Amino acid sequence: MEKFTDYLKEKLQNEKILAGYINEALEQYFVDHNKELFLATLKEAIIARGGIAKISKEAHINRQHIYKMLSSKGNTSFGNIGSLLNALGLQLKSRSMCVLN
């Protein structure tokens, strides 16, 4: 039986699924301000897409700093989040919270 982590790693190889996964976590963060959940989701995506060592090189952020940033007590800057997302092939975008009828 396939482990969930293996299943998730396989699914996150798809660019659209990866983007949706991160977007859902980010949108949830804006609802409940659960930073730990967002950082855990980002860490899962990084591991699925080659690991922290690979992403640290692409993001130009020290590997140990990424481990610390993504820990449950991690404190990260907006710039570092952007760098990690860019290394994953993603970017932040904004959209209106208003629903037009």
Feature locations, PLM:
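Helix-turn-helix DNA-binding elements, focusing on the entry/boundary residues of the two helices
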Residues: 52, 63, 78-81
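Short basic helix-loop element that most often maps to the first helix and adjoining turn
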Residues: 39-56
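Long, contiguous binding/interaction regions
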Residues: 19, 100-101
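Recognition helix of helix-turn-helix/homeodomain-like DNA-binding domains
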Residues: 60-76
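Short amphipathic alpha-helical elements of helix-turn-helix/winged-helix folds
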Residues: 24, 44-45, 87
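DNA major-groove recognition helix of helix-turn-helix/homeodomain DNA-binding modules
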Residues: 77-95
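N-terminal flexible/basic segments that precede or flank functional cores
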Residues: 1-41
